[in-house]
Amino acid sequence: MDTHSPETQESAPTSRRALLASLIAAGASVAVAGRASAADDAAPTTTAPPLHSDADAATLNSLITREAAMVATYNAAKASVSGDDLAVIELIASHHVAYVQSLAGYLGRKAGATTAPALPVNAGGYSVLAPQLASLEAATAAAHVAALKTIQGLDAATLVASIITVEARHEAALLLSAGGSVDSVASGL
């Protein structure tokens, strides 16, 4: 007797814990990518050195400013939530901290300020905050995509591209965990 109850993709429940787990995995991949791009391997190699352009500094510094603003925004949002909702906010905030650190680490001495004021959001519980934060994630991802079009160095482009994919996951997780549908995530609503 088969007691397995298959659920379709549309009817499968999406828990905040499952979304949290996917965000953890995505954040870890960005942290590793940031460290890998900044690694200095002394072993001789026959391949060409990775492309690193000093012309990317201004663009990357603008991304640091945006990511620092996201950190401040999530830190401010923590006061409005608790429990699992707080865990989600703290996790995403930690990803943005990692992005600031990765971008600043890549730039080294050319990195600018790593703090910025919070972006405006209306105070409220998780169901009020999550859609607003998702919208900020979408705007932040769009800023990274626009920056990617101008970045010349391969290492910088790789780092920024790795951040974009996680920012998109942040947006989706926030929308879904606040009660949005898969369709709203796919259409960006």
What feature does the model see in each segment?
Residues 2-14, 21-189:
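All-alpha RGS (Regulator of G-protein Signaling) helical domain and cognate RGS-like helical scaffolds
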